[in-house]
Amino acid sequence: MDTYAVIGNPVAHSKSPFIHARFAQQTGRIIHYTALLAPLDRFEQTVLDFRKTGGKGMNITVPFKFEAFTLASRLTDRASAARAVNTFRFEETGEILGDNTDGVGLIRDIEVNLNFPLAGKRILLMGAGGAASGVILPLLQQQPDLLAIANRTPDKAVSLQRQFASYSNITTGHYHDFAGQHFDLIINATSASLHNELPPVPADLFRNAFAYDMLYSSRLTPFLELARVQGAGYLADGAGMLVEQAAESFLLWHGIRPETQTVIRQLRDNLRHPTS
């Protein structure tokens, strides 16, 4: 039986095993998929140990996407552009292929599942870590009017801007630099919701905007609750993105892209009723 895992710290909350079990059932594959907690200082060793036991591939989550980029011996074009990796495929040659499916997962969820075209929109992306890195190029490829990147440490946002210097419609700054500005879409790519915290968002930033949290929960995340209070026009968490990016990983491993709408509904039901 082929074995796969999601690796992170923390990772016990991950719904990736639930999702991939549904994909396997849907496509007639027999796999074992588990969640693997890696010590913060032993990511590489944990990955290599998993491969030695016969592991075929991995998904990578917080906080290891940059380390995964470094560990990969070969990269897809989208992982190379992002300089962050969220999927490994272990090749028979011994190589580790690194991919990044975050961006395509986000775009499919927002544009297809939620029917929100990004062309011509003003977008604010909060965060400059691995999650943000993976979605910048796919967002830019949708031709928004503006992509602003806000981060507590502006230098990190500037570094991302330089990665995509061929695009002139990127701006960066601290959160407070965007006070009083209007955005059509505000995306939380920080891990703050994992810790029941909030990025330092200016007052009234969300008014009439579409607020999207890349994390997911059975209830409104702190980010989405703030957006609701501030008058956001629409709220969405990252459950759909999680399923869509997982489908891309499944395609990389098995050569078939599973249907996602049913699994998104199943995930929503599971979040509300965890024993289902």
From Swiss-Prot:
Binding locations of shikimate: 14-16, 61, 86, 102, 216
Gene: aroE
Pfam families, A to Z: SDH_C, Shikimate_DH, Shikimate_dh_N
GO molecular function: NADP binding; shikimate 3-dehydrogenase (NADP+) activity
Assembly and oligomerization: Homodimer.
Keyword Transferase: no
Binding of NADP(+), residues: 77, 127-131, 151-156, 214, 238
Recorded GO CC terms: cytosol
Active site residues according to the UniProt entry: 65
One of the protein's GO biological processes: shikimate metabolic process
UniProt-listed Enzyme Commission number(s): 1.1.1.25
Keyword set, alphabetical order: Amino-acid biosynthesis, Aromatic amino acid biosynthesis, NADP, Oxidoreductase
Role description: Involved in the biosynthesis of the chorismate, which leads to the biosynthesis of aromatic amino acids. Catalyzes the reversible NADPH linked reduction of 3-dehydroshikimate (DHSA) to yield shikimate (SA).
CDD domains: NAD_bind_Shikimate_DH
Protein name: Shikimate dehydrogenase (NADP(+))
Matches recorded under SUPFAM superfamilies: Aminoacid dehydrogenase-like, N-terminal domain, NAD(P)-binding Rossmann-fold domains
NADP found in the keyword field: yes
PANTHER family in the cross-refs: BIFUNCTIONAL 3-DEHYDROQUINATE DEHYDRATASE_SHIKIMATE DEHYDROGENASE, CHLOROPLASTIC, SHIKIMATE DEHYDROGENASE
Pathway entry: Metabolic intermediate biosynthesis; chorismate biosynthesis; chorismate from D-erythrose 4-phosphate and phosphoenolpyruvate: step 4/7
Organism: Nitrosomonas europaea (strain ATCC 19718 / CIP 103999 / KCTC 2705 / NBRC 14298)
Entry-linked InterPro entries: Aminoacid_DH-like_N_sf, NAD(P)-bd_dom_sf, SDH_C, Shikimate_DH, Shikimate_DH-bd_N, Shikimate_DH_fam, Shikm_DH/Glu-tRNA_Rdtase
Family according to the record: Belongs to the shikimate dehydrogenase family.
